Regions:
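A conserved C-terminal secondary-structure "cap"
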Residues: 144-166
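A periodicity- and composition-biased signal for non-globular, repetitive helical segments
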Residues: 19, 103, 165-166
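Active-site catalytic loop in hydrolytic enzyme cores
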Residues: 1-61, 70, 76-79, 83, ...
Protein backbone atom coordinates (compact mmCIF):
# COMPACT_ATOMS: atom_id res chain seq x y z
CA UNK A 1 0.00 0.00 0.00
CA UNK A 2 1.51 3.29 -1.12
CA UNK A 3 0.59 6.82 -0.11
CA UNK A 4 2.07 10.20 -0.96
CA UNK A 5 4.55 9.47 1.87
CA UNK A 6 5.73 6.19 0.33
CA UNK A 7 5.07 2.55 1.20
CA UNK A 8 2.92 2.29 4.32
CA UNK A 9 2.01 -1.41 4.50
CA UNK A 10 1.17 -4.52 2.53
CA UNK A 11 -1.82 -6.78 1.98
CA UNK A 12 -1.70 -10.48 1.23
CA UNK A 13 -4.38 -12.13 -0.90
CA UNK A 14 -6.59 -14.20 1.41
CA UNK A 15 -8.48 -16.42 -1.04
CA UNK A 16 -6.49 -18.39 -3.58
CA UNK A 17 -7.97 -19.29 -6.96
CA UNK A 18 -7.47 -22.45 -9.01
CA UNK A 19 -3.86 -23.70 -9.06
CA UNK A 20 -2.66 -20.83 -6.89
CA UNK A 21 -3.43 -23.27 -4.08
CA UNK A 22 -0.61 -25.50 -5.36
CA UNK A 23 2.04 -22.77 -5.27
CA UNK A 24 1.07 -20.18 -2.68
CA UNK A 25 -0.13 -19.90 0.88
CA UNK A 26 -3.12 -17.65 1.57
CA UNK A 27 -2.40 -14.34 3.23
CA UNK A 28 -2.22 -14.43 7.01
CA UNK A 29 -2.51 -10.73 7.80
CA UNK A 30 -5.78 -9.47 9.21
CA UNK A 31 -7.92 -7.33 6.94
CA UNK A 32 -7.14 -3.66 7.56
CA UNK A 33 -8.16 -0.22 6.36
CA UNK A 34 -5.51 2.41 5.67
CA UNK A 35 -5.99 6.17 5.87
CA UNK A 36 -4.40 7.77 2.83
CA UNK A 37 -4.74 11.52 2.33
CA UNK A 38 -8.05 11.65 4.19
CA UNK A 39 -9.63 8.60 2.53
CA UNK A 40 -9.97 5.23 4.22
CA UNK A 41 -8.83 2.59 1.75
CA UNK A 42 -9.40 -1.14 2.02
CA UNK A 43 -7.73 -3.70 -0.20
CA UNK A 44 -8.87 -7.01 -1.59
CA UNK A 45 -6.99 -8.85 -4.30
CA UNK A 46 -8.54 -10.72 -7.21
CA UNK A 47 -10.56 -13.75 -5.97
CA UNK A 48 -11.12 -12.14 -2.54
CA UNK A 49 -14.17 -10.46 -4.14
CA UNK A 50 -16.22 -13.68 -4.30
CA UNK A 51 -16.37 -13.90 -0.52
CA UNK A 52 -18.82 -11.21 0.65
CA UNK A 53 -17.20 -11.26 4.09
CA UNK A 54 -14.15 -9.50 2.66
CA UNK A 55 -16.03 -6.39 1.51
CA UNK A 56 -18.27 -6.46 4.60
CA UNK A 57 -15.26 -6.55 6.92
CA UNK A 58 -13.67 -3.63 5.08
CA UNK A 59 -16.93 -1.70 5.39
CA UNK A 60 -17.23 -2.43 9.12
CA UNK A 61 -13.63 -1.26 9.55
CA UNK A 62 -14.61 2.04 7.92
CA UNK A 63 -13.37 1.74 4.33
CA UNK A 64 -14.58 4.50 2.03
CA UNK A 65 -13.05 2.88 -1.03
CA UNK A 66 -12.09 -0.71 -1.80
CA UNK A 67 -9.08 -0.98 -4.08
CA UNK A 68 -9.31 -4.27 -5.97
CA UNK A 69 -6.34 -5.17 -8.21
CA UNK A 70 -7.18 -8.31 -10.18
CA UNK A 71 -6.37 -10.92 -12.80
CA UNK A 72 -9.99 -11.98 -13.30
CA UNK A 73 -10.90 -14.85 -15.60
CA UNK A 74 -14.45 -15.52 -14.39
CA UNK A 75 -17.15 -13.27 -15.90
CA UNK A 76 -18.99 -12.49 -12.64
CA UNK A 77 -16.95 -10.00 -10.64
CA UNK A 78 -17.90 -6.74 -12.32
CA UNK A 79 -21.61 -7.44 -11.81
CA UNK A 80 -21.02 -8.67 -8.26
CA UNK A 81 -19.13 -5.51 -7.34
CA UNK A 82 -22.33 -3.56 -7.89
CA UNK A 83 -23.88 -5.64 -5.12
CA UNK A 84 -20.79 -5.49 -2.89
CA UNK A 85 -20.82 -1.69 -3.09
CA UNK A 86 -24.56 -1.41 -2.58
CA UNK A 87 -24.75 -3.81 0.38
CA UNK A 88 -21.80 -2.10 2.10
CA UNK A 89 -22.20 1.49 0.83
CA UNK A 90 -18.59 1.74 -0.30
CA UNK A 91 -16.90 2.79 -3.51
CA UNK A 92 -14.77 0.21 -5.31
CA UNK A 93 -12.09 0.36 -7.96
CA UNK A 94 -11.51 -2.94 -9.74
CA UNK A 95 -8.32 -2.74 -11.82
CA UNK A 96 -8.35 -5.85 -13.99
CA UNK A 97 -5.93 -7.38 -16.43
CA UNK A 98 -6.61 -7.77 -20.15
CA UNK A 99 -5.36 -10.27 -22.69
CA UNK A 100 -4.47 -13.94 -22.62
CA UNK A 101 -1.80 -16.04 -20.99
CA UNK A 102 -0.82 -19.65 -21.56
CA UNK A 103 0.82 -21.43 -18.63
CA UNK A 104 1.58 -25.02 -19.52
CA UNK A 105 -1.74 -26.68 -20.24
CA UNK A 106 -3.76 -23.79 -18.80
CA UNK A 107 -5.13 -20.97 -20.97
CA UNK A 108 -6.24 -17.83 -19.21
CA UNK A 109 -8.47 -15.23 -20.86
CA UNK A 110 -8.61 -12.18 -18.63
CA UNK A 111 -11.95 -10.38 -18.63
CA UNK A 112 -10.67 -6.79 -18.60
CA UNK A 113 -13.56 -4.40 -17.96
CA UNK A 114 -11.96 -2.61 -15.03
CA UNK A 115 -14.53 -0.45 -13.31
CA UNK A 116 -15.21 2.16 -10.69
CA UNK A 117 -18.40 1.45 -8.76
CA UNK A 118 -20.28 3.88 -6.52
CA UNK A 119 -21.58 3.30 -2.99
CA UNK A 120 -25.10 3.07 -4.49
CA UNK A 121 -24.19 0.44 -7.09
CA UNK A 122 -23.91 2.85 -10.00
CA UNK A 123 -21.02 2.11 -12.34
CA UNK A 124 -19.06 5.36 -12.63
CA UNK A 125 -16.55 4.06 -15.16
CA UNK A 126 -16.21 0.85 -17.15
CA UNK A 127 -13.17 -0.04 -19.25
CA UNK A 128 -13.19 -2.09 -22.45
CA UNK A 129 -12.55 -5.81 -22.16
CA UNK A 130 -9.65 -5.85 -24.57
CA UNK A 131 -7.51 -2.71 -24.41
CA UNK A 132 -5.68 -0.59 -21.82
CA UNK A 133 -7.80 2.12 -20.26
CA UNK A 134 -7.21 4.77 -17.61
CA UNK A 135 -10.00 6.74 -15.96
CA UNK A 136 -10.87 8.49 -12.74
CA UNK A 137 -14.01 9.53 -10.90
CA UNK A 138 -14.71 12.07 -8.20
CA UNK A 139 -16.33 10.56 -5.14
CA UNK A 140 -17.99 12.06 -2.10
CA UNK A 141 -16.55 10.18 0.88
CA UNK A 142 -19.44 11.37 3.06
CA UNK A 143 -21.69 9.06 1.03
CA UNK A 144 -19.64 5.98 1.87
CA UNK A 145 -19.43 6.95 5.53
CA UNK A 146 -23.22 7.16 5.83
CA UNK A 147 -24.45 3.59 6.20
CA UNK A 148 -28.11 4.60 6.39
CA UNK A 149 -30.18 3.12 3.60
CA UNK A 150 -33.12 5.24 4.77
CA UNK A 151 -34.13 6.87 8.05
CA UNK A 152 -35.01 3.49 9.58
CA UNK A 153 -32.24 1.25 8.27
CA UNK A 154 -28.49 1.32 8.83
CA UNK A 155 -26.67 -1.41 6.91
CA UNK A 156 -24.07 -1.91 9.64
CA UNK A 157 -26.01 -1.24 12.84
CA UNK A 158 -29.03 -3.33 11.76
CA UNK A 159 -26.99 -6.51 11.37
CA UNK A 160 -28.18 -9.31 13.64
CA UNK A 161 -24.80 -10.89 14.38
CA UNK A 162 -26.33 -13.36 16.80
CA UNK A 163 -28.30 -14.86 13.91
CA UNK A 164 -25.35 -15.51 11.58
CA UNK A 165 -22.80 -18.25 11.39
CA UNK A 166 -19.21 -17.08 11.47
Amino acid sequence: IVSSKGVIDSYRKIHLYFKEKLWFSPGDKKIEVFEIDGAKIGIMICFDWIFPETARTLSILGADIIAHPSNLVLPYCQKAMVTRCLENRVFAITANRIGKEIRGEDNFNFTGASQITSYNGKILSSAPTNKPFVDFAEVDLKKSRDKKLNRFNNLIKDRRKEMYLS
